[in-house]
């Protein structure tokens, strides 16, 4: 809740060329000032940040991705314009959610998602054994630790989870996520217990992926990974050309 993220450098990547004739402008909602129609992003921010939205008859669910991976894939596409999905997936192997939880979707399924623009990503909590107990040290994206404890406690009260004797939330500043599940005895199969909890609580979640965006042609459509990157490369080439033309015009005015 109180984590501070310093995004100044990243914001510069999105805004640095704004005053250099790179994009078109339009009036804002009340006509009091003009605002850019798009930002002259120097990186494919749509893939990096991810987004979600819904409209009549369509929806968009794009997960976030790793900055280095996306940039490397884009450079590969520039060097090899005919690169296929498999070649791009050497660099972008899966989405990159802001958590240490594990993505359990197979690499083959992930490639199919990037190829078709549709699918789902499965993610489960990361845990380890400690003094005979289970310690959860990372939860799936947007999963609340208190809600997970409530779900487990409800099963204990309903006598559907006889293997567990105690729950503790030991999360603190040093360990943002540390949920302890104490088994009833040392004879409890922890792997079997966790398999049950993965199936019945939010310790395992599925995230829908739908790469439905408005393309360079101004029309919405589901796009594959390579189509998204190619659209951005096309946009970036237009942006760079407009920037150079703007600078040339300024120089000619001074001569």
Regions from the PLM with identified roles:
Residues 14-42:
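P-loop NTPase nucleotide-binding/switch module
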Residues 2-5, 9-13, 18-21, 25, ...:
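C-terminal interaction appendages of subunits in large macromolecular complexes
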Residues 32-48, 53-56, 61:
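Long insertion/accessory domains within large nucleic-acid-processing enzymes
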């Amino acid at each position: 809740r109180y984590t501070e993220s310093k995004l100044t450098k990243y914001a510069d990547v999105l805004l640095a060329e704004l005053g250099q004739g790179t994009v078109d402008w339009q009036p804002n909602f009340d006509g009091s000032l003009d605002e850019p129609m798009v930002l002259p992003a120097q990186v494919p921010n749509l893939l990096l940040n991810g987004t979600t939205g819904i409209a009549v008859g369509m929806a968009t669910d794009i997960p976030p991705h790793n900055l280095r991976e996306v940039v490397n894939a884009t450079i590969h596409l520039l060097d090899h314009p005919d690169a296929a999905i498999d070649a791009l997936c050497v660099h972008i192997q899966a989405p990159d959610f802001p958590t240490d939880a594990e993505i359990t979707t197979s690499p083959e399924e992930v490639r199919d998602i990037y190829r078709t623009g549709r699918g789902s990503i499965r993610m489960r909590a990361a845990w380890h054994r400690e003094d005979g107990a289970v310690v959860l040290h990372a939860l799936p994206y947007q999963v609340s630790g208190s809600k997970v404890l409530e779900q487990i406690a409800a099963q204990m009260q309903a006598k559907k989870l006889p293997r567990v004797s105690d729950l503790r939330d030991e999360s603190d500043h040093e360990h943002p996520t540390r949920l302890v599940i104490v088994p009833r005895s040392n004879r409890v199969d922890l792997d079997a217990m966790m398999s049950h909890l993965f199936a019945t609580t939010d310790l395992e979640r599925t995230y829908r992926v739908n790469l439905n965006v408005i393309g360079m042609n101004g029309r919405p459509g589901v796009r594959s990974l390579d189509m998204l990157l190619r659209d951005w490369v096309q946009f970036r080439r237009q942006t760079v050309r407009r920037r150079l033309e703007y600078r040339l015009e300024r120089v000619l005015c001074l001569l």
